[in-house]
Amino acid sequence: MLGSKTTAGKRAMAAVREALGVIERRHGITHSWLSEKALHTFDGFITKDNTVVGVFEAKSRAASYEDGCIKYGGVLYPTYLITSKKLENGAVWARKFNVPFFLLVNLEESGHVLSFMVSDKAGKILVDFEEKASTTQATVNGGYMTRANSFIPISQALVFDIK
């Protein structure tokens, strides 16, 4: 089942859409989401003045932004962990559409959104990251999976305070 169809998935989607809505109103952009009825390798398009200016992947976490780190479960993390395949897929789509790829992370507990410009319009990865195999939660619904994950320094994000 698609994560967006479960209670946890619906809650996360609502939270990230609300957070990105604040950024839209402040900066005159629109996040156009792909259909939730199927799996996609990125979440949608960023448009400005009816022109596509980026592709994006959006996440929402029950975490906060503190001292330049993500605070989750009482622990400060200087990096954001994401499946490496998400970065690779986003860069491919950036190249295909000739626009940058952004990773947007809503930190629900503090009212911040991290925006990483992951690749340029040619699909060239712009962020530094460490890649290693690690076991993490498989989906918003739980389960565990060992896979290649990328650890991106929080210092590479543009931080939006959306409170």
Question: What annotation goes with each model-predicted range?
Answer:
Residues 33-39, 102-110:
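Acidic carboxylate-rich catalytic motifs and surrounding loops in phosphoryl-/glycosyl-chemistry enzymes
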